[in-house]
Regions:
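Conserved N-terminal substructure of TIR/SEFIR domains
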Residues: 1-62, 131-132
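Short beta-strand/turn micro-motifs composed of small residues
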Residues: 9-10, 70, 98
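Arginine/glycine-rich "motif VI" loop of SF2 helicases in the C-terminal RecA-like domain
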Residues: 27-31, 86-94
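Conserved TIR/SEFIR loop-to-helix hotspot centered on a Trp-containing motif
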Residues: 72-89
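Short beta-alpha junction loops
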Residues: 94-104
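Glycine-rich, charge-decorated loop segments at or immediately adjacent to ligand/cofactor-binding or catalytic sites
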Residues: 102-115
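Short acidic-hydrophobic, aromatic-tinged amphipathic segments that line or gate anion-handling sites
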Residues: 115-123
Length: 132
């Protein structure tokens, strides 16, 4: 299976472990999952927002899929909102998954044709990416 280029958008301060779980599934030969991670693995709290946006834009542009991990505080993240809008602008295949069903989704995910994984499980996320 060819690796799917996926930009993973998530609340760095609260949900990094979910991103790491996706990468662990990718690394485990027992899982039929192939992911080429394009996400930025640093906190984006910087005084040079323009430079950060250029790096993130290039990574999103180099991806085919955009996967938003919706954690408890994701809807409050200005960076995640910006990443979603950038991915839509760049016409990426949109996928979203909530870490808990009662998490509030970022409003930017509505009305953009995103495929939703019904739970944060390997099969559900894989299926949503395949449908996107």
């Amino acid at each position: 299976m060819a690796k799917k280029k996926v930009f993973i958008s998530y609340d760095y301060d609260n949900d990094k472990h979910y991103k790491n779980l996706l990468l662990a599934w990718d690394a485990n030969k027992e899982f039929d999952f192939s992911l080429y991670d394009q996400s930025v693995d640093v906190s984006v709290d910087s005084t040079d927002a323009g430079a950060i946006k250029r790096v993130i834009s290039a990574r999103i542009n180099n991806s085919t899929y955009f996967l938003c991990i919706v954690g408890k505080h994701t809807h409050k993240s200005g960076w995640v909102a910006w990443e979603i809008n950038k991915a839509v602008e760049l016409k990426k295949k949109m996928v979203a998954v909530k870490t808990a069903k009662d998490n509030q989704s970022p409003s930017e995910l509505f009305g953009i044709g995103a495929e939703w994984a019904l739970s944060f499980t390997f099969e559900s996320i894989k299926s949503a990416i395949e449908r996107a």
